[in-house]
From Swiss-Prot:
The gene is glyA. Keywords: Amino-acid biosynthesis, Cytoplasm, One-carbon metabolism, Pyridoxal phosphate, Transferase. This is Serine hydroxymethyltransferase. It comes from Pyrobaculum arsenaticum (strain DSM 13514 / JCM 11321 / PZ6). Its EC number is 2.1.2.-. It is an enzyme of class 2 (transferase). Its cofactor is pyridoxal 5'-phosphate. The modification N6-(pyridoxal phosphate)lysine is found at K226. One of its GO terms (biological process) is glycine biosynthetic process from serine. Its main location: cytoplasm. Gene3D superfamilies: Aspartate Aminotransferase, domain 1, Type I PLP-dependent aspartate aminotransferase-like (Major domain).
Length: 429
């Protein structure tokens, strides 16, 4: 018998699993689910191990199999991205960002990036990572009509401020940033260019979003668990050979010691699966995002950037100020088992009072949903926003999800493999 308090915690985990995997429509743009195979190999002994240092140069013994996996994972990502340097040791996208800033920007240096209301991530801003490293920030200007960076005004900002680093990419990211144009301007001013690819990394691997390294960026940073449906983790990929040592030292010993080694095998599985299934998956994700946006507009819940076709990524952004704002709407949708997040939009006076919500279709696409299902999701959302009791919508959402429980775009597993993994960990004999 387990102690009661442990039974209670286990029950919470099981209830959560059932709720999020089987009963909700998850539209959080920064989340996803691993394939069954990736999730299986994520359960491994490396979860309790250390491997400080780099492949072949560790501060601990017992790392020969860690070295093997990290080496093949690094090389496979380098080939996929056309990078001369890849580091899979950062434990998150933010840690990857911080390490890159530390390596490329001198103390007291200047970074040009987007503020949060224009889609920049908090780690690109002085409320987050830049403040921690005491770096200065200049804002990249925004063109509301194009819902993108204003290249002409950005040229003036970069030429006048002469930043050490220009950051592109973001957390609200509907359309590819003008990477090539900004990279040319930045390089002429002596700045490095970093593209935070966390949200669109799976779309890059899947070939439906431009590869920033081929567009002129010096560095890609990313997480490995959004449109790239792997375990939570981070990655740096670069084409700056003169800064490799600085990047390596920034990752360790400055910002990490333990790299959460158990994620390596699952990340490798995910990369191989994306090589096999990623092109179709990425194409479907972008199609579904556009379909959801169009269906929401038909339901009287119009997303932003209609004139531009709403989106070219996995994301849809909706101004819900007339429905009570982002806080209220996100909470009300959760009552109906529709999970979204509140999000600031470019015209908001304060990011603490966001007028919008952000939706992402990558996880529901992973469960096999297509354009028809996006139209059904739009109807569920519209019912809640029109004032219908969320409890009734919740019942319909749970019933709807029953047909979409199998994770697609990955390899299958069988009981024999599950038994091998469990026995290798002595979970049973």
């Amino acid at each position: 018998m387990l102690p009661k308090e442990l039974e209670e915690i286990i029950d919470v985990v099981l209830v959560h699993n059932n709720w999020r995997r089987r009963e909700t429509i998850n539209l959080i743009a920064s989340e996803n689910v691993m394939s069954p195979l990736a999730e299986l190999v994520y359960l491994n002994d490396m979860a309790g191990r250390y491997a400080e240092g780099t492949v072949g140069n560790r501060y601990y013994q017992g790392t020969k199999y860690v070295d093997l996996i990290e080496d093949v994972l690094t090389k496979r990502f380098a080939k996929a991205l056309g990078a001369t340097y890849v580091d899979v040791r950062p434990v998150s996208g933010t840690v990857a960002n911080l390490a890159t800033y530390f390596a490329l920007v001198p103390e007291g240096g200047v970074v040009a990036s987007l503020p949060v209301k224009y889609g920049g991530h908090i780690s690109h801003n002085t409320v987050g990572g830049l403040k921690a490293l005491r770096l200065k920030m200049v804002e990249l200007p925004w063109d509301l009509d194009r819902f993108n960076i204003d290249v002409d005004r950005a040229r003036k900002v970069i030429e006048e401020a002469k930043p050490n680093l220009v950051i592109l990419g973001g957390s609200l990211y509907l359309f590819p940033h003008p990477i090539r144009e900004i990279a040319e301007i930045a390089k002429a001013s002596g700045a490095y260019v970093l593209h935070d690819s966390a949200h669109v990394f799976g779309l890059i691997i899947g070939g439906v979003f431009p590869n920033p390294l081929k567009e002129g960026a010096h560095v890609i940073t990313t997480s490995t668990h959004k449109t790239f449906p792997g375990p939570q983790g981070g990655l740096i990929a670069a084409v700056v050979e003169d800064k490799v040592n600085d990047l390596q030292r920034a990752v360790f010993p400055v910002f990490t010691s333990n790299y959460h080694l158990h994620r390596y095998a699952a990340t490798y599985v995910t990369l191989v699966e994306m090589e096999h299934f990623g092109a179709e998956y990425a194409r479907r994700v972008v199609e579904n995002a556009r379909a959801l946006a169009e269906a929401l507009a038909e339901q009287g819940v119009p997303p932003v950037a209609e004139a531009l076709g709403y989106t070219r990524t996995h994301q849809v952004a909706v101004d819900v100020s007339k429905f009570g704002g982002g806080d209220k709407v996100a909470a009300k949708l959760e009552e109906a088992n529709i999970i979204v997040n509140k999000n600031a939009l470019p015209w908001d006076k304060s990011v603490l009072k966001p007028s919008g919500i952000r939706l992402g279709v990558q996880e529901m696409t992973r469960f096999g949903m297509g354009k028809d299902e996006m139209r059904e999701i739009a109807k569920f959302i519209a019912r809640v926003l029109s004032g219908e009791d969320p409890a009734g919508v919740r019942r319909d959402v749970a019933e709807f999800r029953k047909a979409y429980l199998e994770i697609k775009y990955g390899f299958k597993i069988d009981r024999e493999l599950v038994d091998k993994v469990f026995k290798s960990l002595s979970l049973y004999t």
